[in-house]
Design a protein with these regions (language model features):
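Cytoplasmic helix-loop-helix junction between adjacent transmembrane helices
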Residues: 112-153
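Extracytoplasmic gate region of multi-pass secondary transporters
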Residues: 37-38, 220-264
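Helix-loop-helix hairpin linking two adjacent transmembrane segments in secondary transporters
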Residues: 137, 146-193
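Helix-breaking motifs and short loop linkers at transmembrane-helix boundaries and internal kinks
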Residues: 49, 81, 102-108, 250, ...
Length: 406
């Protein structure tokens, strides 16, 4: 745990801010590519004449491709310059997204999503490794908060823009827009990403010792379990919020979109604040406070009365998004600091893989618990909330076991 009194100056200088914004821009396009699939579902169902089960296969194919790629990538990602790895993966991601833009059959779209998932799933791990390598511990919270702001920006700016493009020009153009947006980001990455050579000795490509090294250490397993519990503590509820608010609370689709727009704006601001507080008061302490505070909106949102006014319900969802997403910032800073630089890329690739698995488990768990009534509403959302509380308490316990080494 950090000693706050001994922390040096934590001010982010200009070139560091530019790097944070560049990494956040890469994440923005990556997250937008994933998130835009949900509101575009109706377009796919109609054009390809598929049912919801086949559409869920498109979604899960991305997640599982990302998980497998991240796990395999853990074997060799630390053998390459961080900049070279980031550029290669981002090019592959843009190619996969471009394939989505020209997809005209269901099978081709499935192939395109798998391609995007393979590269997109590894980008996050490399970006987080760059933060861990470039920023010292006392600045890592701010840097992580800035990059995490990409999720909020994707919710507020990316997804609504993608929907409008789909409405006016067609869903293919939404993916084309992401590619066009990503090209200048790619150029900036080539020009300005710092060169971070591998700290490892040359090894055979087929050598799996790095993956074994990551998974064989107890401290690594504790850190991985810690972050999986953090993700499960949010995603068990997040995956069902929209349908619950629409079916049970009577929200219109426009009002449902307000959940993400308002919540995204607030989390964009709060992510920087949480990062600052994490650096000033310590990651463990801020994480503890945020988890305890987050339990309140988790229980509130899963127990909302049907006659609650819309503005009050939106207030609950906004507080939920701010606090639940806020937990991730200090937890991610703790995670990157629990790994030595020479294996950080491999570890973060494994973590990205398990993060994809955790999001899938959270969705499956919520789906198994919820019961749809004949009138279309859902029951047992409260039980989903109790599971989320349990995962958060587990994360709180495991956070005390995470050892800071770098």
């Amino acid at each position: 745990m950090e000693s706050v009194a001994s922390l040096p100056k934590t001010k982010i200088v200009r070139h560091e801010l530019f790097l944070i914004l560049l990494l956040a821009s890469i994440q923005f396009t990556n997250i937008m590519d994933f998130m835009i699939m949900f509101p575009l579902q109706d377009y796919f169902l109609k054009q390809f004449q598929i049912d919801t089960a086949m559409f869920s296969l498109v979604l899960s194919s991305y997640s599982f491709a990302a998980a497998i790629a991240a796990l395999i990538g853990a074997n060799f990602i630390d053998r390459f310059n961080r900049k070279s790895a980031a550029i290669f993966l981002y090019v592959g991601f843009l190619v996969g997204t471009a394939l989505c833009a020209v997809a005209n059959t269901y099978s081709f779209l499935l192939f395109a999503r798998i391609t995007a998932g393979i590269f997109g799933g590894m980008i996050s791990g490399v970006i987080l490794s760059i933060i861990g390598d470039v920023f010292p511990m006392e600045k890592r919270g701010k840097a992580m908060g800035g990059v995490m702001g990409a999720f909020s920006a994707a919710s507020v700016l990316g997804v609504p823009s993608g929907i409008r493009i789909a409405m006016t020009s067609g869903w293919n153009y939404t993916f084309a827009f992401i590619v066009v947006l990503g090209l200048p980001i790619l150029v900036l990455a080539i020009l300005y990403l710092p060169s971070l050579p591998s700290k490892m000795e040359k090894q055979k490509v087929a050598d799996f010792s790095q993956l074994i090294n990551v998974l064989s250490k107890r401290d690594h397993l504790v850190a991985l379990a810690f972050f999986m519990s953090v993700i499960l503590g949010g995603f068990t509820v997040v995956t069902s919020i929209a349908v619950f608010m629409e079916r049970n609370m009577g929200f219109s689709k426009t009002q449902v979109s307000h959940i993400y727009e308002i919540g995204g704006i607030c989390t964009f601001v709060s992510s920087w604040i949480v990062g600052f507080l994490s650096d000033k008061f310590g990651k463990h302490k801020v994480f503890l406070i945020l988890v305890l505070l987050a339990l309140l909106p988790i229980l509130a949102i899963t127990h909302l009365p049907k006659d609650l006014p819309v503005y009050m319900a939106l207030g609950v969802t906004t507080v939920f998004m701010v606090l639940v997403s806020g937990r991730v910032i200090p937890s991610m800073a703790m995670l990157t600091s629990a790994i030595r630089p020479e294996v950080r890329g491999s570890f973060m690739s494994v973590n990205s893989s398990l993060q994809s698995v955790a999001t899938g488990i959270g969705a499956l768990l919520a789906g198994a618990i919820l019961i749809q009534l004949p009138n279309g509403t859902f029951e047992r959302f409260d039980i989903v909330g109790y599971f989320a509380v349990g995962f958060n308490l587990l994360a709180l316990y495991l956070s005390r076991k995470v050892k800071i080494v770098s």
